[in-house]
Amino acid sequence: MRFAFAVLAVLAAASSPVRAEDDAPVGEKGRPAEKGTLGVGIIVGEPTGICAKIYLAKDRALQIAAGSAFISNGLQLHADYVFHPWILQDRDSFVLPVYLGPGVRFIDYGGGSQGDSHFAAGLRGVIGMLFDFKNAPLDAFLELAGIVEYDFKSGNGAGAALNFGGGVRYYF
């Protein structure tokens, strides 16, 4: 139950009206103006696979990933709507913003030793840190996500999980 309250707190913080550098035009503070809005790359952790991020505005983005969930032993797909409310550092060569937001996760748990496969769907609350290079079309990230999910296998019901990962994306 405490975990559910923590996820709700993350979701409430994500909907907060506070935004990073609202008055600064793109290119002066935050994301470089010449960088593309679509990034494609790899994520390592839980899951390990491919990821993409598309900026909808300078401080909001949609990020997705698909890959193998080694700890959970299955194929995972997730999507998050993230906000970049705080910039920790803004240097000549990089920007270091924090991001957070709500999302969804779908996972097909593999058979394991019993050989039975089952499907679960859930809500994610993600928080992460982005190392956004200003002089190259790259970023690197670390993120932690809490998940409340429903397992559709009879008898398993609701559950909770954590995902942690890091990765690199190239922007077009």
Question: Where would I find each of the regions flagged by the language model?
Answer:
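Cleavable N-terminal export/targeting peptides
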Residues: 1-30
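Predominantly the C-terminal beta-signal and adjacent terminal strand-loop region
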Residues: 74, 134-172
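Glycine-centered flexibility sites
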Residues: 39-41, 45, 49, 101-103, ...
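Short glycine/proline- and aromatic-enriched beta-strand/turn motifs that initiate or cap beta-hairpins
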Residues: 20-71, 76
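Residues that define the transmembrane beta-barrel architecture of outer-membrane proteins
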Residues: 34-36, 46-48, 73-77, 96, ...
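Gram-negative (and chloroplast) outer-membrane scaffold detector with strong preference
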Residues: 54-140
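A general structural-boundary detector
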Residues: 7, 14-18, 39, 68, ...
